[in-house]
Amino acid sequence: MGKPWSDRFEVGLHPFIESFNASIKFDFLLLQEDLDGSIAHARMLGKTGIINADEASQLEKGLNQIRLEASQGVFNADQPAEDVHFAVENRLIELLGPLGKKLHTGRSRNDQIATDIRLWLRRKIDEINFDLENIQKILLGHAEKNLYTLIPGYTHLQRAQPVSLAHHLLAYLEMFQRDRDRLVEVKSRVNTSPLGAAALAGTSLPIDRLYTADQLNFTSIYSNSLDAVSDRDFAVEFIAASSLIMVHLSRLSEEIIFWSSEEFSFVKLTDRCATGSSIMPQKKNPDVPELVRGKSGRVFGHLQALLVMLKGLPLAYNKDFQEDKEALFDTVVTVRNSLQAMSILLEEGLEFSLDRLGSAVESDFSNATDVADYLVSKEVPFREAYQIVGRLVKLCMKEGILLKDLSFDQWQDMHPAFDQDIYKRLTPEHVVASRISQGGTGFAQVSAQLENWQNQFSSLKE
């Protein structure tokens, strides 16, 4: 079937340019959304009397027939059409004859594709939110089992203070919750209908934009037709939000990679989620977190590509917009695959080495801050206490011992405020339990955090 504009041109399009210009191989992914938007548009044309009710009904039946053919694999991306819109229109004309040519009345591909993308992305945001909730629940399950499991806490990748493993894991629940909140905010801006803006200036026909918006469950319509067809802010926002999801997944991946190394040995990778080496038989490689860490760069790249693509575009529609779809599509696939792979890894692929974690928090100076706090409780100014503890640590390092190994005379020589109870204050359990500030790693505080998360997920079920 010839192109709609062929009567305007004297010669056909160069074959390579035709292929270069086509987008059907990737925008066919929007078929269901294109059919949904077209059905809403056909109903509106019938409601407003632009076409009669019988014609509107026949158009809807034809569009549903195409949907059926697609589900059977008969109607697919192997169409001699530039894009999904023309593929649908061509097939509709084959099914209905001249009536099929009426579907595009009062509509342009410009507002059509803008509508399709929003419908598709709205659904994908919900799917990603589900994936995020799932990984949160898996992390929460680990946290519930490890309230009293202690792990070294780090700053600058140097041991700093011991923390509850549950507290550490709950930090990622917080990150993923912010990701979910951002997606909800993005969805609120995705959920605005551009349908009816036509090419850029609206239409002279008496269309009803509010009706089509309601049919497609949009919450509002664009108030400026130029903005409606040229706005891709929502796509940038979505990929930016997705980039932060990948940042958080990458940070978690980095920790799992460290933890599974011989140098840390905080976790063991199970055979279900690890691979081996082709030459080194002893190896068990953390491929899943490494891949997730690597894939974050893809999403960051899509964000940069979209920003650069948009920055110099005049109003309204430009063919450059064709480049937004592959960035969006691949972002969704990458984020969902990464979330699902990490969820499987967390649920089935790693085991915490409790003995190793226990020995790790007993073998360093991460209790030094508590010695300073002890002196502060004895009315020693903090900065003076800090300096005293610094000298104690230096003494221990010189003698090759830990703070707990100092004799009581050595404590007293450093400051008379030290009493026998200093030894109890040095135990990792006491160090962690003493963190009573809201949001801290103290067992009571983490227990409250666990309860808050449990209540949050329970309320979602109701």
Curated annotation (Swiss-Prot):
Source organism, top-level taxon = Bacteria
The pathway to which it is assigned is:
Amino-acid biosynthesis; L-arginine biosynthesis; L-arginine from L-ornithine and carbamoyl phosphate: step 3/3
Q: Which reaction does it catalyse?
A: 2-(N(omega)-L-arginino)succinate = fumarate + L-arginine
One example GO MF annotation: argininosuccinate lyase activity
Is Acyltransferase set as a keyword in this record? no
**Matches recorded under HAMAP family:** Arg_succ_lyase
Which protein, by its recorded name, is this? Argininosuccinate lyase
What organism is this sequence from? Answer: Prochlorococcus marinus (strain MIT 9211)
